[in-house]
Amino acid sequence: MGMSKSRGCFGYPLSIFFIVVNEFCERFSYYGMRALLVLYFRNFLGWDDDLSTAIYHTFVALCYLTPILGALIADSWLGKFKTIVSLSIVYTIGQAVISVSSINDLTDHDHDGSPNNLPLHVALSMIGLALIALGTGGIKPCVSAFGGDQFEEGQEKQRNRFFSIFYLAINAGSLLSTIITPILRVQQCGIHSQQACYPLAFGVPAALMAVALIVFVLGSGMYKKFQPQGNIMGKVAKCIRFAIKNRFRHRSKAFPKRNHWLDWAKEKYDERLISQIKIMTKVMFLYIPLPMFWALFDQQGSRWTLQATTMTGKIGTIEIQPDQMQTVNAILIVIMVPIVDAVVYPLIAKCGFNFTSLKKMTVGMFLASMAFVVAAIVQVEIDKTLPVFPSGNQVQIKVLNIGNNDMAVYFPGKNVTVAQMSQTDTFMTFDVDQLTSINVSSPGSPGVTTVAHEFEPGHRHTLLVWGPNLYRVVKDGLNQKPEKGENGIRFVSTLNEMITIKMSGKVYENVTSHSASNYQFFPSGQKDYTINTTEIAPNCSSDFKSSNLDFGSAYTYVIRSRASDGCLEVKEFEDIPPNTVNMALQIPQYFLLTCGEVVFSVTGLEFSYSQAPSNMKSVLQAGWLLTVAIGNIIVLIVAEAGHFDKQWAEYVLFASLLLVVCIIFAIMARFYTYINPAEIEAQFDEDEKKKGVGKENPYSSLEPVSQTNM
């Protein structure tokens, strides 16, 4: 062990400052990078939503699986300090690689704005993510445990508060990064073409990771450093394997039972190691139900964000984007951690209630379950406002009259009259085999035109009409609300030439006469656009402004030449109404989930450290983090296998599962007895001094020093 430094500040070791700043910078780096991944996969690498989501969750799961490797390296080979430094270098390289992979101009040899060697970008991205997963996962179990190592005996209160400060640093880094990196992403940059600036958005987190490494190394002279005690995980595995094999060899009634199944390893392994493994397995047993909490918690970045895309973000004069709602959790954490630590827990203690670690974790699981009940209620309210889209054997159609006369349209069992430059109020729904014929006529004009078109099942269509025998059927291409709360806009031109429209950096090319462009998607707010055409009178403007777009809407803009003066005019028609349920209704579910996180996650970190033997602290921290990985895997399984017709039903399922797990955990915790590993090991040290090292120790089973139920 390194020399213990006497320098301190407010009762805390000064070295803690470097560890907390390191964690803040590292979490900024990780969450800033992670916030961009799905959009990077979809918009830069060109993957579809399903593949992007699968790779994203696989990466997150890998980040929480690699802590096992980090714990093995720290406890068996390099020690915590050298492990953190070594894997932080790997981490920084990974961040730099993914930043380079996002440079469009790296392979854009023809300067068309698209990379010519996409497989190279994919390969670099995967290498970068693999290095990041190894780096961030490898240091996870080491940093918090290394911070706990800096405290002396008798500083239990300061150590417990350190874990709260440590968790506060995590969420402060997360909060700032999720605000800043999306702003960096929307900047335009590039040598040959202006693109979303992923290199800058990834580059800043890479720079912060380098800062984290430098800050951590600067504190080197102040740290208490414990030397690794051999391949502890290997010893544990061998001891457990020997105990199981020895027990089955002696399963006959002729052999007396032993107090604990691990006592069957006493023929080969010393009592100290067996006792330490008993401590570890008791804690690991409590970890079994925990992944269910993380299965719910990590859906903030997926299901809850998708829920926000079906809501409106206008709160007074403030406008919130759907992916910004994730910052609510980080903001609440920064506020609530000190309040809970300095106010709530002391008040509970003054009331005489023994609010132990496992009781706190049980309450946290219950609160997370209730958060999903609230999410289900919000989803029910959202579902009431969502438009109905056609099923697989249905067709939806509306009529848009872009002519100068009223038009009558005859559907099977339904007739509508549409005034000039107007549309039907809603989409009409028909079974595919029901829509056999559509007839169109114009009042005052002889004859009826029959629309000959084969409608595609499961899609919306628009019937454009502008006179007798003049029509066109357009497949809309929108069978759901626009993603991420954006707004879809398409143009229909009645001009007699091919035109181009430029709107907020996007181009609608070659829009032909009396046809519809594809939808392009824009965030909320008013958008400027320019119509390039020769069919415009002198002194007339070709520059226009859209209406003030809300969230999740879609519109058709019809362009025509005004008969009175030859100037262009544009009329807006609503295809999908904007969202009406406000994102503010998500705040209660975020509040409940954050309350659950504060009393569950912070407590879990401290519990894992306090109950671990000195040589197995990183192992138990890795076990704690492994529960997060398994939780992400549960989400993947349920998402793939569930296929719920209603999203609220999936929320209720998750809430019910966690509630059941919460009850099971409470029962398990009731039978757990708290121990002080340091005092137990001190007893072993004292006994070995009396009897001599290597002699048989009288402790045949672990007797707890202090006992507290749950």
Swiss-Prot record:
Residues 75-82, 140-161, 220-276, 349-361, 608-621, 669-710 are cytoplasmic. It is found in: Apical cell membrane. Residues 383-586 are annotated as: Extracellular domain (ECD). This is Solute carrier family 15 member 1. Signal peptide: none annotated. It is a multi-pass membrane protein. The gene is Slc15a1. One of its GO terms (biological process) is protein transport. Residues 687-710 are annotated as: Disordered. Residues 698-710 have a biased composition (Polar residues). Glycans are attached at N415, N439, N510, N532, N539. Keywords: Cell membrane, Glycoprotein, Membrane, Peptide transport, Protein transport, Symport, Transmembrane, Transmembrane helix, Transport. GO terms for cellular component: apical plasma membrane; brush border; membrane; plasma membrane. GO terms for molecular function: channel inhibitor activity; dipeptide transmembrane transporter activity; peptide:proton symporter activity; proton-dependent oligopeptide secondary active transmembrane transporter activity; tripeptide transmembrane transporter activity. The keyword Membrane applies. The chain crosses the membrane at residues 1-21, 54-74, 83-103, 119-139, 162-182, 199-219, 277-297, 328-348, 362-382, 587-607, 622-642, 648-668. Belongs to the major facilitator superfamily. Proton-dependent oligopeptide transporter (POT/PTR) (TC 2.A.17) family. Interacts (via extracellular domain region) with trypsin. PANTHER family: OLIGOPEPTIDE TRANSPORTER-RELATED. Residues 22-53, 104-118, 183-198, 298-327, 383-586, 643-647 are extracellular.
